[in-house]
Swiss-Prot record:
Family: Belongs to the long (3 C-C) scorpion toxin superfamily.
Entry remark concerning the domains of this protein: Has the structural arrangement of an alpha-helix connected to antiparallel beta-sheets by disulfide bonds (CS-alpha/beta).
Tissue: Expressed by the venom gland.
Keywords noted in UniProt: Disulfide bond, Ion channel impairing toxin, Neurotoxin, Secreted, Toxin, Voltage-gated sodium channel impairing toxin
Protein name: Toxin Boma6e
Single GO MF descriptor: sodium channel inhibitor activity
Function: Binds voltage-independently at site-3 of sodium channels (Nav) and inhibits the inactivation of the activated channels, thereby blocking neuronal transmission.
């Protein structure tokens, strides 16, 4: 498990503006909890605590939306 920004497809973070949204998103994906990281290196995005290894996370590089 690891603490990280949870990622969507194509290395894109989940943008948000509320801790409740991030906590729900992270726990539904198996994390212990989640929070809204404001003004982070990837903008306002969800940060998960104890995210399982099988869930994608934001890695270095750009978001590549189709």
């Amino acid at each position: 498990v690891r603490d990280a920004y949870i990622a969507q497809n194509y290395n894109c973070v989940y943008a948000c503006a509320r801790d409740a949204y991030c906590n729900d998103l992270c726990t539904k994906n198996g994390a212990r909890s989640g929070l809204f990281a404001t003004f982070g290196p990837h903008g306002d995005a969800c940060w998960c605590i104890a995210l399982p290894n099988n869930v994608p996370l934001k890695v270095q590089g750009k978001c590549h939306r189709k």
